[in-house]
Every structure is written in C-alpha cells, then in structure tokens.
C-alpha cells in the first residue's frame, strides 16, 4: 500500500508536468473504485486549470481552477475553484505520459492535459490513474481551501509529521492514557498522520522502542526519540523514492528503493544490522510487525 512517502514522491513528480495545464478531456473507463466516480466528474473537470497539488496524509489534493470564461460569467460552482481528492488505495498509481500506451484493464481514468494560460509552449500529456485492486478513490469537492480541513475524509487526520508543531511533547500528549500498543497507536493516524506499516516498524527500531510497548507508558524522553525517528525515516524514504514492494511506481514509472536498506521490515530471521540478533516477526492487528528483540525494549 502506498504510504506517505510514496504519495509525496508522486506529488513531487507530478508538479512540473501537471501544474498550470488545462484539463482538455476526462476519460473514465471504470467508475467502481472504493467510492464510485460520480457521473458528473467529466463535466465538472473539463476546461479547468490545475493550480496546485497538495498532500494531506495519504491524500493528493489537486486544485482545479475554473476556466476564465466561467469566472467572467459570474457566480456558481462552475465559477469557483474546487479540489480533486485522490487516494491511491493499495495498488494505485498516477503516471504522466507524453504519448500513453493503449489503456489496460486496470487503467481507470485519464486526464488529457493541454497547455494552459501560463504553459503555452507545453506539449499535451495524459495523467493516468491505474489501480488493479480498485481500493483507490477519485472524488470531487467544491470546498474552498479554508474549508478543506473539515472534509469528512480529512477532518480526523492527525498532524503532519513534518509540521513544526510535531515533536516529542505532541506525541507524548497524544499517547497519554492509551492502553494499545505503540505501533497500533501510530497506525491509527489521529495523533500523527502517514506513519504506515513499513515506516512504523522502521521508526520504532530507530527509536529503540519495542512495537508491543503500551503507548500510554512511553516517557516524554522516549516520545522525543520516536518523533525524531518518524521524521528521519519518512524524510529518508521520500529521498529514496519511497518503497516498491509490489505495485508502486512514481509518476515517471520509476521504482522506489528505500526497502532495500530497511533495518527490520520484511527481514524476519535475518541478522540485525546493528547487533546481529535475528529479526523477529509478529502479527499486530492482522499486520506484520518486525523488530529486533535486543535493540528494542
């Protein structure tokens, strides 16, 4: 499943090829994603300009500005900015093609992007959403930017891990009173967002914390170590293009390679890179957890 680093890698890869372009056409081949693609999506998007691409947790947010003629025409939804919310689900990818190959069975949506007002020399490209398992989502919302935090899919997300406010004290307050294991508490995403399964195991290793430790019993000092480890792990993963375990590729088709140097994830039985103790694997909430019984306590 694409986690925060993979979504951020996708966002950064799209920026130079997508921002400022006009949506000339929308082709929806399959509407049966996690939530059905609305029948009006083609009409809502065609003619709009992609202004910005933001990220909130694992959601990509594409700002879709109204065409100039709609703005001049007056008020109404067509004359107001809106946002396209994209979630990659378990197997989704967004890729940019100058000349796209023939669509396959899992290529569900294309945005045909022409030159925009500020990209007059740009050649047309296609932004294609592919998702073999169809757990991804493409949703339109007419909300203004100031109202986006209140969107039902975004309102309960925790703080971003790169937000300056996220530190050990924030983590310590958020975990206070929680009896669940620290790994489960991090995966919940309501204290800090985007620390998925791979990066949770890796962050806990770097912080020296066993994943079964009760979240509410972590001291402030250990939370400070964990907050630093979360940031460092995610930043390193982004710099390495994310992790490609099965389906993920960036917007240009390139694979990530963070997984090649993981300390514990998917290394059950192999020696710890620090102490040589065999890495252990357990199940927590039906998900695999990896840790070193010597380095983590």
UniProtKB/Swiss-Prot annotation:
Keywords: DNA damage, DNA repair, DNA-binding, Glycosidase, Hydrolase, Lyase, Metal-binding, Multifunctional enzyme, Zinc, Zinc-finger. Pfam families: Fapy_DNA_glyco, H2TH, zf-FPG_IleRS. It comes from the Bacteria. Its EC number is 3.2.2.23, 4.2.99.18. DNA binds at residues 106, 133, 178. InterPro entries: DNA_glyclase/AP_lyase_DNA-bd, DNA_glyclase_Znf_dom_DNA_BS, Formamido-pyr_DNA_Glyclase, FPG_cat, MutM-like_N-ter, Ribosomal_uS13-like_H2TH, Znf_DNA_glyclase/AP_lyase, Znf_FPG/IleRS. Its cofactor is Zn(2+). A zinc finger (FPG-type) spans 263-297. Signal peptide: none annotated. The active site is at 2 (schiff-base intermediate with dna), 3 (proton donor), 58 (proton donor), 287 (proton donor). GO terms for biological process: base-excision repair. The keyword Transport does not apply. Monomer. Involved in base excision repair of DNA damaged by oxidation or by mutagenic agents. Acts as a DNA glycosylase that recognizes and removes damaged bases. Has a preference for oxidized purines, such as 7,8-dihydro-8-oxoguanine (8-oxoG). Has AP (apurinic/apyrimidinic) lyase activity and introduces nicks in the DNA strand. Cleaves the DNA backbone by beta-delta elimination to generate a single-strand break at the site of the removed base with both 3'- and 5'-phosphates. HAMAP family: Fapy_DNA_glycosyl (MF_00103). Belongs to the FPG family. This is Formamidopyrimidine-DNA glycosylase.
């Amino acid at each position: 499943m694409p986690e925060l680093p993979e979504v951020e890698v996708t966002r950064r890869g799209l920026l130079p090829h997508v921002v400022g372009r006009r949506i000339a056409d929308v082709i929806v081949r399959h509407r049966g994603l996690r939530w059905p693609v609305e029948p009006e999506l083609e009409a809502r998007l065609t003619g709009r300009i992609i202004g910005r691409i933001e990220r909130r947790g694992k959601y990509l947010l594409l700002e879709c500005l109204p065409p100039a003629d709609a703005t001049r025409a007056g008020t109404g939804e067509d004359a107001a900015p809106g946002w396209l919310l994209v979630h990659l689900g378990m197997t989704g990818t967004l890729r940019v093609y100058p000349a796209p190959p023939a669509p396959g069975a899992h290529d569900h949506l294309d945005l045909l992007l022409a030159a925009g007002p500020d990209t007059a020399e740009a050649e047309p490209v296609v932004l294609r959403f592919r998702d073999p398992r169809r757990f991804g989502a493409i949703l339109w919302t007419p909300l203004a930017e100031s109202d986006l935090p209140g969107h039902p899919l975004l309102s309960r997300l925790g703080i971003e891990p790169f937000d300056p406010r996220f530190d050990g004290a924030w983590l310590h307050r958020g975990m206070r009173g929680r009896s669940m294991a620290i790994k489960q508490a991090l995966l919940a995403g309501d204290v800090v967002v985007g620390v998925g399964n791979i990066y949770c195991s890796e962050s806990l290793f770097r912080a020296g914390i066993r994943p079964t430790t009760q979240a509410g019993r972590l001291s402030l000092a250990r939370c400070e170590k964990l907050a630093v480890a979360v940031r460092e792990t995610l930043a390193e993963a982004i710099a390495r293009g994310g992790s490609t375990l099965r389906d993920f590729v960036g917007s240009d088709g390139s694979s990530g390679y963070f997984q090649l140097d993981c300390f514990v994830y998917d290394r059950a039985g192999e020696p710890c890179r620090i102490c040589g103790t065999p890495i252990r694997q357990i199940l927590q909430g039906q998900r695999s957890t990896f840790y070193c019984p010597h380095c983590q306590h």
